[in-house]
From Swiss-Prot:
Binds 3 Zn(2+) ions per subunit. NCBIfam families: PRK09248.1 (NF006702). It comes from Shewanella sp. (strain MR-7). The keyword Metal-binding applies. Its EC number is 3.1.3.-. This is Probable phosphatase Shewmr7_2686.
Length: 252
């Protein structure tokens, strides 16, 4: 089964990625992806796009040839306080805000620091999805993080790229996160973390973990465009109202 939604992609605007929006649209059409988010790295990363890149995402059309586009960011969690590198009214102009740890911005420290930073980001109300929380370079108190995510309505990502090209050794942590999410009622989403369009919608490894713990697939945000759009609307993203009529025939 091809899940029709991908929340985590990078374009050539992040210079260690290799595809354009046009490339992603073409692959989405081929694979049956109905909605994807463009989420380039936040400005604190060395090769990230300029701040204006995110401001000007408003020029992107809502839908091209039947494929919807969400305007987003993968922000960086910068410190123990859980602050991210995108702020103010600009956040409200985006459809979706991802955030996670990246070594060039927040070097690995210790379990207590990572846990506090992640929970503070969750509590901030600014972040919709925590990216690659299973990264073994950043050990966390999984139960504490998942509990906070469930309480504050923030989704946790099972990152497919973590099992293929980055963050080697993530399997055990991701399995524990998925299991805790099932037990504590937290929302999960699979992210391809594509840095080239060919991997858009690639969830095989992430899905194997979801299935191994028997996480309810009717709670996965990837299950339909409306499932994700409803989630984002509930989190205060008024801008997604523009997209909802385009998926009016969709079952959440």
């Amino acid at each position: 089964m091809q899940y029709p939604v991908d929340t985590h992609t990078h374009t050539v605007a992040s210079t260690h990625a290799y595809s354009t929006i046009h490339d992603y649209l073409a692959v989405a059409k081929q694979k049956g992806i109905r909605l994807f988010a463009t989420t380039d790295h936040g400005p604190a990363m060395a090769d990230a796009p300029h701040f204006w890149h995110f401001v000007n995402l408003r020029v992107l059309p809502r839908m091209v040839d039947g494929v919807g586009i969400l305007r987003g960011i993968e922000a960086n969690i910068k410190n123990r306080e859980g602050e991210i590198d995108y702020f103010g009214d600009y956040l409200s102009q985006l459809d979706i805000v991802l955030a996670g740890f990246h070594e060039p911005v927040f070097p690995p420290s210790d379990k207590a620091t990572h846990t506090e930073a992640m929970i503070n980001a969750i509590k901030s109300g600014k972040v919709d999805i925590i990216t690659h929380p299973g990264n073994p370079a950043y050990p966390i108190d999984i139960e504490a993080v998942v509990t906070a995510a469930a309480e504050y309505g923030v989704a946790l990502e099972i990152n497919n790229s973590s099992f293929e090209v980055s963050r080697k050794g993530s399997e055990a942590n991701c399995t524990a996160i998925a299991k805790a999410a099932k037990e504590l009622g937290a929302t999960l989403v699979m992210g391809s973390d594509s840095h080239v369009a060919f991997s858009l919608g690639g969830f095989d490894r992430a899905l194997s973990i979801i299935e191994a713990v028997d996480y309810p697939k009717d709670k996965l945000l990837n299950r339909s465009p409306m499932a994700l759009l409803n989630f984002l609307a509930q989190r205060g993203h008024k801008s997604v109202a523009d997209l909802m009529p385009l998926f009016s025939d969709d079952i959440a």
